[in-house]
């Protein structure tokens, strides 16, 4: 779809959406996003120019259907997929991608660390994906030196980062905010460092006693991203991995650095979003969102959850969707889904489905709470169908029509029950929605009440 849009830009020194927006240009991607979001195109351009919105759209991802992440647009949901050395393969990951897109993922991150040739897995995912693809390049950098962290060099990181850009990756998690002086701050934590990428960088710094190479070479990464329009997703290496560690000095020190890096990238017209926690008690979620906006000059916030309790392994799609809905309400731009398998293992297709639906609910609830124009239209339409006992329309309007139909069919599978004025909960005689109050009923009631009032 984008080949003709991109052709005139190829070979230019800076092809980012932010670069064009700051020149006053409304790109085809911005216009496409405006129509998807039902917002004015000049508003999209202005938000991208300001840095409050990103359109992750690598020039080499030509089959992408552009979307926006930002405070002015709908709250988005990311799904993580990826093969591991112990489970999954390229075909399974492409199927997970298709399932994620089917159930509403706005972006997908390929977090593959094994299970085959990582370049082939990534290429297959990008070629099959109409949504933006994100990656964490430090995983492949480590794989390129056979897991020997001490052998990693800055050039190894930069080589992998550029390779991902060449393949068409739309945004990359860059763990540049973790500084060597931050490491002592994790001493008082229960769970230390829980970011895989952050853990790799921390081990590298501890071995070499040198500053984070992604930080010292940040401007080199900027130069790479400019040529492809790859967006930064600045990784929060020190995100809290449990409630005890939330909002601590380690997390907030890194956040301050992430804000500084955001502004450096903006100086070169490179798009940025900032990643956030994690595990956060409900009473600290608003603080975390407000603090990120303050430190990072309102760059879009992209949070993992957050989980609001640590005691529910197997149900962390629920514990985190609670926090995600609150974070979205307070202004988070994108929510990274958590599956029921979180902390326990690699998610399968059903886990992806359950995690995504939980997060589509959270994002939609946030849009309603933020009074986004039209956010509640679908809810109202489904409610009217429910009141009219239009079961098929209810199914069609559901976030997961297959699951809604499946549950109805468990007790009332026959077609005749798809027009019945009851379900198996109340049965045919006790459903309160059978009580239809007409205009005529209300008119008669008003007359009675007026008469009764006069007599009193």
Swiss-Prot record:
Cofactor: [4Fe-4S] cluster
Name of protein: Phosphomethylpyrimidine synthase
Keywords: 4Fe-4S, Iron, Iron-sulfur, Lyase, Metal-binding, S-adenosyl-L-methionine, Thiamine biosynthesis, Zinc
GO biological process terms held by the UniProt record: thiamine biosynthetic process; thiamine diphosphate biosynthetic process
Binding positions (substrate): 80, 109, 139, 175, 195-197, 236-239, 275, 302
NCBIfam families in the record: PRK09284.1, PRK13352.1, thiC
Record's GO cellular component terms: cytosol
Record's catalysed reaction(s): 5-amino-1-(5-phospho-beta-D-ribosyl)imidazole + S-adenosyl-L-methionine = 4-amino-2-methyl-5-(phosphooxymethyl)pyrimidine + CO + 5'-deoxyadenosine + formate + L-methionine + 3 H(+)
Keyword Cell cycle among UniProt keywords: no
GO molecular function annotation: 4 iron, 4 sulfur cluster binding; carbon-carbon lyase activity; zinc ion binding
Top EC class, one word: lyase
A Pfam family of this chain: ThiC_Rad_SAM
Record: residues binding Zn(2+): 279, 343
TM stretches of this protein: none
InterPro entries reported in the protein's UniProt record: ThiC, ThiC/Bza_core_dom, ThiC/BzaA/B
The gene coding this protein: thiC
Protein EC: 4.1.99.17
Pathway terms, separated by semicolons: Cofactor biosynthesis; thiamine diphosphate biosynthesis
Binding-site positions, [4Fe-4S] cluster: 423, 426, 431
Its biological purpose: Catalyzes the synthesis of the hydroxymethylpyrimidine phosphate (HMP-P) moiety of thiamine from aminoimidazole ribotide (AIR) in a radical S-adenosyl-L-methionine (SAM)-dependent reaction.
Comment on bound cofactor: Binds 1 [4Fe-4S] cluster per subunit. The cluster is coordinated with 3 cysteines and an exchangeable S-adenosyl-L-methionine.
Lineage: Bacteria, Bacillati, Cyanobacteriota, Cyanophyceae, Synechococcales
Family classification: Belongs to the ThiC family.
């Amino acid at each position: 779809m984008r080949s003709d849009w991109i052709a005139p830009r190829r070979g230019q020194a800076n092809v980012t959406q932010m670069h064009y927006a700051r020149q006053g240009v409304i790109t085809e991607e911005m216009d496409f996003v405006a129509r998807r979001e039902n917002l004015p195109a000049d508003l999209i351009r202005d938000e991208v120019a300001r840095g409050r919105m990103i359109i992750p759209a690598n020039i080499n991802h030509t089959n992408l259907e552009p979307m926006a992440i930002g405070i002015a647009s709908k709250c988005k949901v990311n799904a993580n997929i990826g093969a591991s050395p112990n489970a999954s393969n390229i075909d399974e990951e492409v199927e997970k991608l298709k399932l994620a897109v089917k159930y509403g993922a706005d972006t997908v991150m390929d977090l593959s660390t094994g299970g085959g040739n990582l370049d082939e897995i990534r290429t297959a995912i990008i070629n099959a994906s109409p949504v933006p693809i994100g990656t964490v390049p430090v995983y492949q950098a480590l794989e390129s030196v056979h897991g020997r962290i001490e052998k990693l060099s800055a050039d190894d990181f930069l080589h992998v980062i550029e390779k991902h850009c060449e393949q068409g990756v739309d945004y990359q998690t860059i763990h540049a905010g973790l500084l060597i002086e931050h490491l002592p701050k994790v001493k008082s934590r229960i769970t230390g460092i829980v970011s895989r990428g952050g853990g790799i960088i921390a081990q590298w710094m501890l071995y070499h006693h040198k500053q984070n190479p992604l930080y010292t070479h940040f401007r080199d990464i900027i130069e790479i991203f400019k040529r492809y329009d790859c967006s930064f997703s600045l990784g929060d290496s020190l995100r809290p991995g449990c409630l005890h560690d939330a909002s601590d000095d380690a997390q907030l020190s890194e956040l301050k650095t992430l804000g500084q890096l955001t502004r450096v990238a903006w100086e070169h017209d490179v798009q940025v979003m900032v990643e956030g926690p994690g595990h956060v008690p409900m009473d600290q979620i608003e603080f975390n969102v407000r603090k990120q906006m303050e430190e990072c000059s309102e760059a879009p916030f992209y949070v993992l959850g957050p989980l609001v309790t640590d005691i529910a392994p197997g149900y962390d799609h629920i514990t985190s969707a609670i926090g995600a809905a609150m974070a979205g309400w307070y202004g988070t731009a994108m929510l990274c889904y958590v599956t029921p398998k979180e902390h326990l293992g690699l998610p399968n297709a059903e886990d992806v489905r359950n995690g995504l639906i939980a997060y589509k609910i959270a994002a939609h609830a946030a849009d309603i709470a933020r009074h986004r124009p039209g956010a509640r239209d679908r809810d109202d339409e489904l409610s009217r169908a429910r009141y009219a006992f239009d079961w098929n329309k209810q199914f069609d309007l559901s976030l997961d029509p297959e699951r809604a139909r499946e549950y109805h069919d468990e007790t009332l599978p026959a077609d005749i029950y798809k027009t019945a004025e009851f379900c198996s909960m109340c049965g045919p005689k006790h459903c309160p929605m059978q009580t239809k109050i007409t205009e005529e009923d209300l008119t008669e009631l008003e007359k009675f009440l007026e008469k009764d009032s006069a007599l009193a």
